Amino acid sequence: MSDETAKPFEPKPCPICGKPSIERYKPFCSKRCADVDLNRWLTGAYAIPVVEEEDEDGEPLSPPLRPE
């Protein structure tokens, strides 16, 4: 690929505030936005929805037991 056809690097927007991201905190624009995202993960704000399965009786399956 020649230099004439190469596109200059354009940073993607920060997923928290929308400002351009910077290399140091990629994909975020700042330490603050990176910390906001980490806090959302740690407090459960980001979650994957789960469909509860039922057994043959129509009763919900019991949650798996945690090893102690």
Swiss-Prot record:
GO terms for biological process: regulation of DNA-templated transcription. Binds 1 zinc ion. Its cofactor is Zn(2+). Keywords: Metal-binding, Zinc. GO terms for molecular function: DNA topoisomerase type II (double strand cut, ATP-hydrolyzing) inhibitor activity; zinc ion binding. Gene3D superfamilies: Erythroid Transcription Factor GATA-1, subunit A. Disulfide bonds: none annotated. Zn(2+) binds at residues 14, 17, 29, 33. Interacts with GyrB. Belongs to the DNA gyrase inhibitor YacG family. NCBIfam families: PRK01343.1 (NF002362). Inhibits all the catalytic activities of DNA gyrase by preventing its interaction with DNA. Acts by binding directly to the C-terminal domain of GyrB, which probably disrupts DNA binding by the gyrase. This is DNA gyrase inhibitor YacG. It comes from Azorhizobium caulinodans (strain ATCC 43989 / DSM 5975 / JCM 20966 / LMG 6465 / NBRC 14845 / NCIMB 13405 / ORS 571). The lineage of its organism: Bacteria, Pseudomonadati, Pseudomonadota, Alphaproteobacteria, Hyphomicrobiales.
